[in-house]
């Protein structure tokens, strides 16, 4: 017979899959798909488990004697188990001193093992509560971060509105309104010979170009103010 196979505490590294999940394969959709969900049973740490098993199995289903009642206080039972472990450990030391080869040594070791199993079982029964508390804390942190982000956004928005109002207040009063600049004046096509093909004279084009230059300068000044605001901490 061959030697029993050693079961590793950790799964082996999936080196055969690393080369398949390159950036190019992922972009082109050539990366292997994830395995389908397990429906029946699976192996973990050398043991077989069923998918419909309870997360925390009762002690009786594992063939372990129950030392505490069905209805109990976890804190009190953990304190009692902790004290029992200490007393049994002292008894074990006494046995090792007086009669190391006695059969009571094995019995005391089994008692300690049973007590530790119960301690771990009671601690594991707190795992669902711990998961709920962890989820609650995580959601509270996310909520606080979103509120802080919204508050910072509101402050930046108020600063932008204030700067725009200051810029508007600094504009000259004789600056033409945007509506007047956007409005297109309909003129007959039979203009005199001094006008060009669009019905505008050279003087009108010069005036409109001058106004356009003034508006561009104001826009550039506003952009500089906004850039300075973004650079501030």
Swiss-Prot record:
<keyword id="KW-1017">Isopeptide bond</keyword>
<dbReference type="GO" id="GO:0003712">
    <property type="term" value="F:transcription coregulator activity"/>
</dbReference>
<comment type="subunit">
    <text>Component of the Mediator complex, which is composed of MED1, MED4, MED6, MED7, MED8, MED9, MED10, MED11, MED12, MED13, MED13L, MED14, MED15, MED16, MED17, MED18, MED19, MED20, MED21, MED22, MED23, MED24, MED25, MED26, MED27, MED29, MED30, MED31, CCNC, CDK8 and CDC2L6/CDK11. The MED12, MED13, CCNC and CDK8 subunits form a distinct module termed the CDK8 module. Mediator containing the CDK8 module is less active than Mediator lacking this module in supporting transcriptional activation.</text>
</comment>
<dbReference type="GO" id="GO:0006357">
    <property type="term" value="P:regulation of transcription by RNA polymerase II"/>
</dbReference>
<dbReference type="InterPro" id="IPR051669">
    <property type="entry name" value="Immune_Mod/Transcr_Coactivator"/>
</dbReference>
<keyword id="KW-0539">Nucleus</keyword>
<keyword id="KW-0805">Transcription regulation</keyword>
<dbReference type="GO" id="GO:0070847">
    <property type="term" value="C:core mediator complex"/>
</dbReference>
<dbReference type="InterPro" id="IPR009244">
    <property type="entry name" value="Mediatior_Med7"/>
</dbReference>
<protein>
    <recommendedName>
        <fullName>Mediator of RNA polymerase II transcription subunit 7</fullName>
    </recommendedName>
</protein>
<feature type="compositionally biased region" description="Basic and acidic residues">
    <location>
        <begin position="203"/>
        <end position="213"/>
    </location>
</feature>
<comment type="similarity">
    <text>Belongs to the Mediator complex subunit 7 family.</text>
</comment>
<keyword id="KW-0804">Transcription</keyword>
<keyword id="KW-0010">Activator</keyword>
<dbReference type="InterPro" id="IPR037212">
    <property type="entry name" value="Med7/Med21-like"/>
</dbReference>
<keyword id="KW-0832">Ubl conjugation</keyword>
<dbReference type="GO" id="GO:0016604">
    <property type="term" value="C:nuclear body"/>
</dbReference>
<comment type="function">
    <text>Component of the Mediator complex, a coactivator involved in the regulated transcription of nearly all RNA polymerase II-dependent genes. Mediator functions as a bridge to convey information from gene-specific regulatory proteins to the basal RNA polymerase II transcription machinery. Mediator is recruited to promoters by direct interactions with regulatory proteins and serves as a scaffold for the assembly of a functional preinitiation complex with RNA polymerase II and the general transcription factors.</text>
</comment>
<dbReference type="Pfam" id="PF05983">
    <property type="entry name" value="Med7"/>
</dbReference>
<dbReference type="InterPro" id="IPR044888">
    <property type="entry name" value="Mediatior_Med7_sf"/>
</dbReference>
<feature type="modified residue" description="Phosphoserine">
    <location>
        <position position="194"/>
    </location>
</feature>
<dbReference type="GO" id="GO:0016592">
    <property type="term" value="C:mediator complex"/>
</dbReference>
<feature type="cross-link" description="Glycyl lysine isopeptide (Lys-Gly) (interchain with G-Cter in SUMO2); alternate">
    <location>
        <position position="185"/>
    </location>
</feature>
<feature type="region of interest" description="Disordered">
    <location>
        <begin position="188"/>
        <end position="213"/>
    </location>
</feature>
<dbReference type="GO" id="GO:0035019">
    <property type="term" value="P:somatic stem cell population maintenance"/>
</dbReference>
<feature type="cross-link" description="Glycyl lysine isopeptide (Lys-Gly) (interchain with G-Cter in SUMO1); alternate">
    <location>
        <position position="185"/>
    </location>
</feature>
<keyword id="KW-0597">Phosphoprotein</keyword>
């Amino acid at each position: 017979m061959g030697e029993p196979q050693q079961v590793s505490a950790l799964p082996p590294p999936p080196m055969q899959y690393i080369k398949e999940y390159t950036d190019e394969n992922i972009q082109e959709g050539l990366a292997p798909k994830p395995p389908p969900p397990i429906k029946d049973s699976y192996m973990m740490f050398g043991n077989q488990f069923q998918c419909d098993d309870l997360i925390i199995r009762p002690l009786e289903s594992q063939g372990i004697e129950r030392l505490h009642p069905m209805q109990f206080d976890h804190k009190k039972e953990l304190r009692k188990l902790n004290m029992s472990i200490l007393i049994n450990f002292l008894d074990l030391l006494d046995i090792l001193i007086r009669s190391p080869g006695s059969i009571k040594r094995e019995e005391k070791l089994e008692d300690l093992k049973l007590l530790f199993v119960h301690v771990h079982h009671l601690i594991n029964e707190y795992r669902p509560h711990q998961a709920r508390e962890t989820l609650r804390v995580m959601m509270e942190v996310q909520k606080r971060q979103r509120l802080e982000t919204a508050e910072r956004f509101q402050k930046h928005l108020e600063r932008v509105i204030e700067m725009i109002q200051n810029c508007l207040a600094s504009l000259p009063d004789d600056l033409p309104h945007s509506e007047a600049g956007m409005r297109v004046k309909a003129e007959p096509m039979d203009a005199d010979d001094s006008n060009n093909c669009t019905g505008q004279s050279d003087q009108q084009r010069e005036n409109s170009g001058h106004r356009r230059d003034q508006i561009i300068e104001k826009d550039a000044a506003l952009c500089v103010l906004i850039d300075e605001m973004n650079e501030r901490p």
